[in-house]
Regions:
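Long, terminal "pre-/pro-" and other extracytoplasmic accessory regions
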Residues: 2-9, 14-171
């Protein structure tokens, strides 16, 4: 019985380590792909958040590579409705807006709006602060959440291929 328990524990630990290793490699690959796609892009996340304000209150924003193409996506909230605003990363202007009506996107938007409902500082303001405090870095994502009942934004920054995440208080 004891040998079986040890074998199961070792197998579980091995599987867990393998999953974590795969996740780290996947995350590294995504970061490398994003860093490469951002080379030469003049539009900042802050400008994208500002542009999206015409469609509602920005509740999250990020650069991402989707189908091999760079995209600047901002979730906004207007009343009780949510939208995904795609900002053209070449011009800094809104390219298209789509309603968020279900699935994981709606779940994420609701959680983000809950965090943003308790803020005194805008997501753009928090992002600008993070960039100002981290010279030579640019923001690639800003995601709000509640920590111990207080709203914070996790701002992911990049300089070349170096990524780091900082927390900014929103209250």
């Amino acid at each position: 019985m004891r040998k079986t328990l040890v074998a199961v524990t070792v197998t579980f630990a091995w599987l867990l380590a393998g999953q974590l290793s795969w996740a780290q490699k996947s995350n590294y690959k995504e970061h490398a792909e994003l860093a490469k796609a951002l080379k030469g892009v003049k539009t900042s996340l802050e400008k994208g958040l500002a542009a999206s304000e015409t469609q509602g209150k920005p509740i999250s924003g990020k650069f991402e590579v989707e189908d091999g193409k760079l995209q600047l996506s901002v979730y906004t909230m207007k009343g009780d409705k949510f939208s995904e605003v795609i900002v053209d990363h070449k011009t800094g202007k809104v390219a298209k807006t789509e309603a968020i009506t279900g699935g994981d996107d709606l779940t994420a938007a609701k959680a983000q709006s809950e965090a943003m409902a308790k803020t005194k500082l805008s997501l753009r303001g928090a992002t600008e602060k993070a960039v100002k405090e981290n010279k030579e870095f640019r923001a690639v994502s800003a995601m709000p959440s509640l920590k111990d009942g207080h709203p914070v934004a996790e701002i992911t920054l990049v300089k070349g291929e170096e990524f780091k995440t900082v927390s900014e208080k929103l209250d």
